[in-house]
Amino acid sequence: MNFLNFSILIFAYLLGSINSAIIVCYIFRLPSPRSVGSGNPGMTNVLRIGGKVPAAITLIFDILKGLVPVVIAKVLTGNEFITACTALYAILGHIFPIFFGFKGGKGVATLIGTLFGFSWILGLIFVITWLCVAIITRYSSLSALVATVIASFSVIFTSDLQVAAPFLIIAIIILVKHKGNIQRLISRQESKIGDKAKAKNDSN
């Protein structure tokens, strides 16, 4: 690995480590997303806490955290594997941010950015899948899980296994981070889109 590739990976991780939800809530003088609602510093929890505008800003910045480094890697290296690894590092930064005690979000919005940066088709697959599941079930977490699995495994059909491997790792990490959501989905206790935030519970 040369210096350029190494620098891009470090940049992706550091950019991913900037938690948009915490910063946006601070700017809008909202409660910390880590202390109310699900306790997860992500877009969905910001939506419950502060409404559409703060949530939209959070979503945009989280997507850009994945999109920007992946596009940079794609343009500067022309190497699909390095580009896929850049996506993984951006996700790792979001989920395990060095600036916030390695306790971050669940990586879904940042994954959207990495997918669009890697291939707009993969990004479109994610968005369409998410919308379909969300419209039918109104569960944001279920929509994210289904879209993550389908979009990540779709990389296998557009690239070789080595390139797909970082995205498969991303899918596994995101599934593990949603363990609490999966348990609540099974017990029918998961919050639906539009539910208001409550005091922090055991969700992450």
UniProtKB/Swiss-Prot annotation:
<comment type="pathway">
    <text>Lipid metabolism; phospholipid metabolism.</text>
</comment>
<feature type="transmembrane region" description="Helical">
    <location>
        <begin position="81"/>
        <end position="101"/>
    </location>
</feature>
<keyword id="KW-1003">Cell membrane</keyword>
<keyword id="KW-0444">Lipid biosynthesis</keyword>
<comment type="function">
    <text>Catalyzes the transfer of an acyl group from acyl-phosphate (acyl-PO(4)) to glycerol-3-phosphate (G3P) to form lysophosphatidic acid (LPA). This enzyme utilizes acyl-phosphate as fatty acyl donor, but not acyl-CoA or acyl-ACP.</text>
</comment>
<keyword id="KW-1208">Phospholipid metabolism</keyword>
<comment type="similarity">
    <text>Belongs to the PlsY family.</text>
</comment>
<feature type="transmembrane region" description="Helical">
    <location>
        <begin position="53"/>
        <end position="73"/>
    </location>
</feature>
<dbReference type="GO" id="GO:0008654">
    <property type="term" value="P:phospholipid biosynthetic process"/>
</dbReference>
<feature type="transmembrane region" description="Helical">
    <location>
        <begin position="116"/>
        <end position="136"/>
    </location>
</feature>
<keyword id="KW-0443">Lipid metabolism</keyword>
<feature type="transmembrane region" description="Helical">
    <location>
        <begin position="8"/>
        <end position="28"/>
    </location>
</feature>
<keyword id="KW-0812">Transmembrane</keyword>
<keyword id="KW-0997">Cell inner membrane</keyword>
<protein>
    <recommendedName>
        <fullName>Glycerol-3-phosphate acyltransferase</fullName>
        <ecNumber>2.3.1.275</ecNumber>
    </recommendedName>
</protein>
<dbReference type="InterPro" id="IPR003811">
    <property type="entry name" value="G3P_acylTferase_PlsY"/>
</dbReference>
<dbReference type="GO" id="GO:0043772">
    <property type="term" value="F:acyl-phosphate glycerol-3-phosphate acyltransferase activity"/>
</dbReference>
<feature type="transmembrane region" description="Helical">
    <location>
        <begin position="155"/>
        <end position="175"/>
    </location>
</feature>
<dbReference type="Pfam" id="PF02660">
    <property type="entry name" value="G3P_acyltransf"/>
</dbReference>
<keyword id="KW-0594">Phospholipid biosynthesis</keyword>
<dbReference type="GO" id="GO:0005886">
    <property type="term" value="C:plasma membrane"/>
</dbReference>
<comment type="subunit">
    <text>Probably interacts with PlsX.</text>
</comment>
<keyword id="KW-0808">Transferase</keyword>
<keyword id="KW-1133">Transmembrane helix</keyword>
<keyword id="KW-0472">Membrane</keyword>
